[in-house]
Regions:
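A beta-strand edge to alpha-helix "cap/lid" segment located at domain peripheries
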Residues: 2-38, 49-151
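Helix-to-beta-strand junctions that scaffold the AdoMet/dcAdoMet cofactor pocket
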Residues: 45
Length: 151
């Protein structure tokens, strides 16, 4: 069987993708830290596709933003713990495409990670696809998966 191609092997594309993902993750962190959906969603494309950690598929900025705005308007006891975002892996299969795995770690009141066996609060692993248009990076798609113990 012939060897399959590597899609993320251009160092210039990868450097640009890493910078874009770092900036995007910093924006998510700032939005969640301040409870501001405008900041959190600042670079979600108008036609963003979003997979929620509860299995819903949402399409369009207005739909996703309205959910995040309601979520951030709730008191912390309802919205959940504070969080820390961590970039796990970045790929650049093209000059204007970044694909990233980003972990959201749920934190307790002391800033320590909440265990994966907690039934009400959970961390997530997200897969984000960013696309550059007119020198600006936009989130085209995101899929969020709760991190849970193996069954």
């Amino acid at each position: 069987m012939p060897r399959k191609p590597a899609l993320s092997n251009n160092p210039d594309w990868l450097r640009a993708a890493r910078t874009a993902v770092d900036d995007f993750v910093a924006e998510l962190q700032a939005g969640i830290d301040s409870g501001d959906a405008e900041t959190y969603n600042a670079h979600f494309a108008d036609d963003v596709a979003w997979g929620s950690p509860y299995g819903a598929t949402l399409v369009g900025y207005d739909t996703v933003h309205s959910i995040h705005a309601r979520m951030f308007a709730q008191p912390p006891a309802v919205t959940g713990p504070s969080s820390r975002y961590e970039t796990v892996h970045v790929m650049a299969p093209g000059p204007d495409v970044a694909i990233a795995h980003v972990r959201r770690v749920a934190l307790d009141v002391d800033g320590e990670p909440i265990g994966i066996d907690n039934k009400s609060m959970f961390s997530e692993m997200a897969l984000y696809v960013l696309v550059r248009r007119n020198d600006q990076w936009w989130l085209a798609a995101g899929q969020n998966t709760p991190i849970r113990p193996k069954p």
